[in-house]
């Protein structure tokens, strides 16, 4: 394992730079897309996920209930914060592992759910 780590760190870094750029684009797309539909989330600095509070108008729901709502009504899966311990309650996590077109589609679907609560 140590030899593999050395090879990865000392070898060509082209893939690493491409991966970092890909995740940065996805992060920026989701952060700005959610802001555009009224859900302002903090911009993470170095992760492939976004951790954020549930929108205020859904505060009556647990993180699991909100995640279930998004899954059932929008077909979008997020991780409920409660799965990360008691301090995660009230939050959800978006994984930035899908390609940009699917992330755009997910934001459009989430927008419909947020509008339902108005």
Specify the residue positions occupied by each region the protein language model found.
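PLP-dependent class I/II
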Residues: 1-118
